[in-house]
């Protein structure tokens, strides 16, 4: 399952917008308020159509239930109108979201939700996606080994907290579909259900091999190794401590030392990423237990991540996208970020820039570039404080006007501020020395 296209009309800050997505990963960047999270919210709304209806028996539920709650009045774009000295903001209608999705069987499906006015909602072409869901349910209940796609959203409030149990235990009318419970919640991991599954698998594993349980633990280990590739780190093994109800990271070093850390002991950034990987992998195993040891490699789907760089050390920021893609090769990741470090490891064709309600591609290559050039050329951000930039420009002006004494004075100030080993300070010193010859 992959998202091909998203169309927005009068949704939040967007007048009209069409977005196409890469099969592997798409990274959205832009200033605060540019609409990065709004795009994820629009995708969340549309994907809930699939997730909500998959969890319910469509022979008993009303298929249009979610359509009545999809788009809210607060989602309408506001247009400012000047009336004398007063500025009036009026919601613009209709608010329309349309999504086009390709399924794993190459079937293409599109559907729309529309808020015609504050009191009127409508859905279009949802019959096709509902029929697909009903057929999926039928295949599962009759024993067909159909692959269910992972669909999940991890927002900025994502966390793994071993003491705060935010979600009650839940189940689906088809046990296999329990992998979708709260998957688009965005606020927290489904901790209770995940712990229950880990504990149950641990008990079964004492009697016989459980390939899908091994695959889930291996996925967490692989992702950790892909991000934290310290030379002296020999191996990483992931286990589950049933007594402490926590995932354990066991790290083995070349010098023979071993370090065992419960997941909740890790830093917020490490904990957030590894808990997210655990959540994705666990859901895959629930949705597709028949795939056994191949469940991580063979499960496709869509994962939304807001601010993927959140709390991460720059070294992890640089590797996180490639680590997730290698760990879950068939998953389409759609993420937002403020970090230029993330972008240094992402090809420009996978980056979308949001600005003033429009979307653009970077006009320069990004993969392998240094952080400063990404900041300056892609994110349109000064790499130095404005006062420092002005001082560097003043040095250039002094050299151009052959004011050597002034250039020396400015360079002395720059050395005091930046140090003598700063690249531009070194260059300025060379320039000054040449001017004195």
Which role fits each region the language model picked out?
Residues 151-155, 238-239, 301-307:
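Extended hydrophobic secondary-structure segments that form protein cores and membrane-embedded regions
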Residues 100-102, 175-298, 407:
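Extended helical coiled-coil dimerization/tether regions that scaffold
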Residues 70-71, 77-82, 243-246, 295-302:
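A short mid-domain helix/strand-loop element embedded in enzyme catalytic domains
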Residues 1-58, 246-383:
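Switch/communication elements of ASCE P-loop NTPase nucleotide-binding domains
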Residues 46, 196-201, 283, 391-401:
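Solvent-exposed, amphipathic alpha-helical segments
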Residues 326, 341-437:
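RecA-like P-loop NTPase motor core
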Residues 1-193, 208-211, 222-225, 396, ...:
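P-loop NTPase switch/coupling surface
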Residues 166-167, 234, 386-391:
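Short coil/turn segments at secondary-structure boundaries
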């Amino acid at each position: 399952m992959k998202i091909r296209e998203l169309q927005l009309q009068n949704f939040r800050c967007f007048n009209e917008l069409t977005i196409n997505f890469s099969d592997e990963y798409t990274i959205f960047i832009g200033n605060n308020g540019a609409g990065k999270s709004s795009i994820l919210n629009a995708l969340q709304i549309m994907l809930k159509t699939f997730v909500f209806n998959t969890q319910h028996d469509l022979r008993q539920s009303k298929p249009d239930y979610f359509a009545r709650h999809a788009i809210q009045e607060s989602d309408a774009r506001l247009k400012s109108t000047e009336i004398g000295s007063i500025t009036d903001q009026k919601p613009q209608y209709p608010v329309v979201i349309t999504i086009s999705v390709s399924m794993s069987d190459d079937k293409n499906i599109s559907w729309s939700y529309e808020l015609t006015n504050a009191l009127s909602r409508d859905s279009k072409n949802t019959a096709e996606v509902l029929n697909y869901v009903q057929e999926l349910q039928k295949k599962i209940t009759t024993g067909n080994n159909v692959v269910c796609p992972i669909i999940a959203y991890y927002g900025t409030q994502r966390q793994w907290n071993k003491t705060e149990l935010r979600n009650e235990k839940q189940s689906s009318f088809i046990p296999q579909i329990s992998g979708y419970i709260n998957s688009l919640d965005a606020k927290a991991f489904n901790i209770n259900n995940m712990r229950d599954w880990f504990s149950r698998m641990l008990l079964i594993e004492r009697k016989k091999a459980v390939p899908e349980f091994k695959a889930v633990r291996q996925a967490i280990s692989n992702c950790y190794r892909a991000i934290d590739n310290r030379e002296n780190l020999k191996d990483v093994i992931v286990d589950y401590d049933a007594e402490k109800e926590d995932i354990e990271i066991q790290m083995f070093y070349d010098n023979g030392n071993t370090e065992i850390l419960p997941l909740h002991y890790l830093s917020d950034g490490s904990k957030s990423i590894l808990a997210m990987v655990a959540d994705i992998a666990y859901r895959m195993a629930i949705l597709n237990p028949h795939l056994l040891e191949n469940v991580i490699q063979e499960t496709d789907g869509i994962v939304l991540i807001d601010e993927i760089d959140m709390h991460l050390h720059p070294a992890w920021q640089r590797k996180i996208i490639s680590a997730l893609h290698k760990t879950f090769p068939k998953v389409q990741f759609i993420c937002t970020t403020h970090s230029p470090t993330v972008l240094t490891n992402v090809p420009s064709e996978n980056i979308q820039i949001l600005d003033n309600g429009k979307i653009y591609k970077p006009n320069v290559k990004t993969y392998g570039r240094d952080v400063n050039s990404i900041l300056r050329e892609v994110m349109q951000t000064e790499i130095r404080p404005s006062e420092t930039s002005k001082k560097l420009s003043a040095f250039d002006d002094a050299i151009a006007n052959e004011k050597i004494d002034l250039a020396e004075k400015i360079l002395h100030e720059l050395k005091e501020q930046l140090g003598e080993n700063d690249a531009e300070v070194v260059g300025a010193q060379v320039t000054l020395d040449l001017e004195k010859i």
